[in-house]
Structures are given as structure tokens and as C-alpha cells.
Amino acid sequence: MSKLNAYFGEYGGQFVPQILVPALDQLEQEFIKAQADESFKQEFKELLQEYAGRPTALTKTRNIVKNTRTKLYLKREDLLHGGAHKTNQVLGQALLAKRMGKKEIIAETGAGQHGVATALACALLDLKCRVYMGAKDVERQSPNVFRMKLMGAEVIPVHSGSATLKDACNEALRDWSANYSKAHYLLGTAAGPHPFPTIVREFQRMIGEETKQQMLAKEGRLPDAVIACVGGGSNAIGMFADFIDEKNVKLIGVEPAGKGIETGEHGAPLKHGKTGIFFGMKAPLMQNSDGQIEESYSISAGLDFPSVGPQHAHLLAIGRAKYASATDDEALDAFKLLCKKEGIIPALESSHALAHALKLAYEDPNKEQLLVVNLSGRGDKDIFTVHDILKEKGEI
């Protein structure tokens, strides 16, 4: 029986109740078979093209880095059906669930983007869908909650713990433990127990593959750096995967520094966490001196996660990728700038990556460089959050 590697260096693994091991084994075997099955790959490809709208554009910015020698491109995952990169891998996993004969889908969501993507895939493929969402996130992401319900999903608010994404993850795993024979747990990021980090990476890797081809067509060379925000890390690993072996391309992940790393109110476990066991995996984790999981914080619900995918931890450990962070204010400034200068409203998550790219462009305006930011989602869901903050600051 062929097996995928469960670890990335020392990170990853499968720390779950014994009852879930057969379900994870089945998932791994079906994934391996599906990857070798031309008809599965063809169906996935057709859904991505005809339904989701791939390939997405690689847009060269016109004004935002005008006074520098940087060329900045945006990989437009915001143009994907559903509004973010999430749709890619959800379609892949939903097809896998059907292949396994599962009729129900369980999911967790933070910003609601993964929930929306799961709901649309379930509507399309005729699967029953229930989504766990922290009660706090239900409040701050009401448009997405309604979108899920419109597409037939049941949204279950989670009131335990911090009532955010980590609690929704725990509840979803609990549900799956009780119902794995008929339900597939459609995990929303490149984290959690093996084989999820690998499956999600493979179902997102077209982001980097397309970027590579588009960049060669437009510029005749590969970019100097690809930059992506990191919460759980799926949009980033989707961008990085095809560039890992291209040693001249820097891989830069951007974690949320929240109100500032020094305040403790952030979501940057890669650079400021300790290794621990959470959500079925061994990975960097925000924890206090007693080893208790600390609350993560970010202006963007989708980055508000106290851990991170194991492959990112490994890429950092071996020095292949670099991880920076951007504060709420820096992300907000980048958000406003992209709206005003390019006519694109980005997700607050993606704005963290953009903030770092702008920093690179402006710290040495005379440096010639070719940068790509993965614009992982659109910002419609964030306009009310931004409105309230700008109002509070007296800017509107």
C-alpha cells in the first residue's frame, strides 16, 4: 500500500483519536488513486476552468509602485468564483468525497470564505453541507454566513472557547469522529492531521504553476520573490509549491502582526510561537508559558489562527522560505492604497502580503526587482470592518 510522507521534517504527523485513523487512511489511499486517475484529474480541471474560472489573471500593477524600479504583479485569486483561492481545493476535496461514496460534508470556517467555497461545491455536486463557525466570526462576517445559507449549507455557530476559528476546528473534528462513515471532513487549509496538508497543497498548487508560466510569458524570467499571506497557509503553499526547487526565487510568507508582535495580540506562530500539538498535527503554536494555547488576533478573521501548516514550519527550519509579518495598520494602508491606485478591493488577508511587497519596493526604490503577490481573495467581505475602523479613526 503506497503511502505519502506524514511529516515535513519534524512537523506534521497525525495526532487524532484512534477512531479517526481509518478515515484518514481511506482518504490518503483514495487521494493517491485519484492523483493517478486521468478521469479524476480531467474532471477537476474542467470544474476549475468552466465553473471556477481558471486560469486566473496575473495583473501588473500600474500605479502603486510607480516611483520605484520594482515591477509588482498580482496573482488574481480574487477573481476566482467564490471570491478567493479557497474554491480550488474545495472542488478537489468534494470530488474526492464523492469518489469515496460520502454524502455529507463537514467544514470549519473563519472568515467564512472556506465555508462559502464549501457550500458552493456541495450545491454543485449535490452533497449535504454543514459548516462550523466561531460565534464571533458569525457576527463579523454576516454577508458570508448568508451566502452559505443561500447555497443550502447549515451554519453552526460555536460558542465555546474564544468562539473563533480554533474552536470551530475542534467542533468539526468532533462531528467527524461521530460521523466519519458517511461524512467527509473538508478541511479548509494546509494544516491539520496528515494527509490534509499534502492534499490541500496539491489541490492549490496550480496557483504557482500558472504564475510561473504567466511570468515567463510576460517577463521572460521567473520572479525574484513570491509573497503570500499565511494563516493556516494554503494560499501560500499553493503559490510556493512549484517554486520550491527554483532556488533563485525567494518565498516570503507574511503572518499577521495584529496590534504589534510586542503586544502579544497577533497571529504569528511561525516566528513567535513554540512547537506543540494542536488540531491533529505537530506545528508552531501560540502558547503561554504553561503550554496553554493563546488566543491569536488579527484584523482579518481568515488569518486569526493560533497555528500554521507544517510544511511552512519546515520551509522556515531549512531556510528555504522567509516569514515576515505585517500589522493591522500596515495591512489597512495597503488595502486603501490598492483600492485608490489600482481599482482593486483586496481581502484584508491578502493585504498583509501586499503590505510586505510595498515595504520591499519602497525601502530601496532604485532596486530593480520582480515581485508577485498572491492576491488570495477579494475584499467585499471586509468593507464593513474597514468602514468601522476608518470611521473610528476619523478618516471618513
Swiss-Prot record:
Keyword annotations of the record: Amino-acid biosynthesis, Aromatic amino acid biosynthesis, Lyase, Pyridoxal phosphate, Tryptophan biosynthesis
GO molecular function: tryptophan synthase activity
PROSITE patterns with a match to the protein in the record: TRP_SYNTHASE_BETA
Pathway recorded for this protein: Amino-acid biosynthesis; L-tryptophan biosynthesis; L-tryptophan from chorismate: step 5/5
Catalytic activity annotation: (1S,2R)-1-C-(indol-3-yl)glycerol 3-phosphate + L-serine = D-glyceraldehyde 3-phosphate + L-tryptophan + H2O
Cofactor dependence: pyridoxal 5'-phosphate
Enzyme category, top tier: lyase
Residues in the signal sequence: none
GO CC, alphabetical: cytoplasm
Its EC number(s): 4.2.1.20
Residues with the N6-(pyridoxal phosphate)lysine modification: 86
Family, similarity comment: Belongs to the TrpB family.
The protein's role, per its UniProt record: The beta subunit is responsible for the synthesis of L-tryptophan from indole and L-serine.
Entry-linked HAMAP family: Trp_synth_beta
The name this protein goes by in its record: Tryptophan synthase beta chain
Gene (UniProt): trpB
